Amino acid sequence: RWLQIDFSAVVQGYAEKTESEVAPDKIVSLFQSHYLETQNPYQLISYELSRKDGEDSLVVDLTYGSTRLQLEGHAAGVVGAFVNAMQSHSGSEIVLVEYSEHTLSQEAGADAEAVTYVQLNINGQRYCGVGLSTDILEASLRAILSAINQPLNAEI
């Protein structure tokens, strides 16, 4: 429901800007451009995960514009470790508010695409993100970056 509320504002804004009804194919396009194609300024390159004594350590390679970064975070879960890494790097207060995931395919198997939805509170403002991948961890990291990129893209 929280993502529907967030996205409805995007669709409403487009409808008001164009002063027209929004066609179904345009709604799909708006969703893709707002949540799935927000790969700037942060973009995921790779990640490495390790676990010891119940704590996950995550090393992520990212680009921020044309700058390559390697960040590390630690927490009692992969998502928490990534939020920790991004918070330490950015200096922003980042809190995971909502998290949901599911497969997009009815078929089981290694090639099933997963989607992850997140809502983050970044410095007191809420932003939603969506990530897609055949790797559920990668989908989660992409969703977090999608949300983090939202306010940064608004500034550009």
Language model regions located:
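Terminal or standalone catalytic/regulatory effector modules within metabolic enzymes
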Residues: 1-156
